[in-house]
Amino acid sequence: MNKLDFQKKITRLFNKKHYADIKKSAPYPFTVTYHTGSLETPANSIESINAALNDGAEILEFDVTFRPDGTAVIIHSGSPSQTEGVLLDEALAAVAKSDKCKINLDIKSVANLPEVDRLVKKNGLFERCFYTGVFDYWVDTVKKNSAIPFYLNHKITSEEATDKNAAKALAQKAIEMGVIGINSNYKTASKLFVDTMHENSLEVSLWTVNKPKNMASVASLRPDNITTKKPHILNDMK
């Protein structure tokens, strides 16, 4: 038994013991995004992409930025050198081998977004791509330079997590921005917040939930998506 098969076996045994309550509850169709570097692969690599695809990922994520000459690459740094990063074109070509998997393009720079659009269209993936990493100060730039839909990156405040009016105010702001929904760290999310976004036709994506002890509670909030480096555990909860 190789290391990956052993990991799958252990996580399934863990789930059977600790997550029976989730299985008994009414199913909720959240997606699981494979964070770049999942399945013990190097982050922002073709190896990571292929591993996620071979594992049947619904959505995979990698970071997108630009070299000084504007070349689009996948790497976490927002300002790589002229020789750093894997070409975005190569990464997209790898995903294009799948006819289903969607891509979360986590942008670290907005320096040359038209190039991202060009490469996404070239690889026939426009209907399967969306941005995260878009904070409010980047929204106008993204809308002006790219046709790819996006989530608003937002840290949920304690008021937004507990007060419906505050959550509604954020929802209205998000609607005016024209975003798909809210992408946020799971630690400050609440059921009230998620429900309020859903009432306003906005999706909620929560990141990055890697500890098994946190997964059941996050899933119980009923987000639309959960991003993780431990996808087998979350997939077994669905």
Give the residues covered by each predicted segment.
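Phosphate-group recognition and catalysis centered on beta-loop-alpha active-site segments
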Residues: 1-238
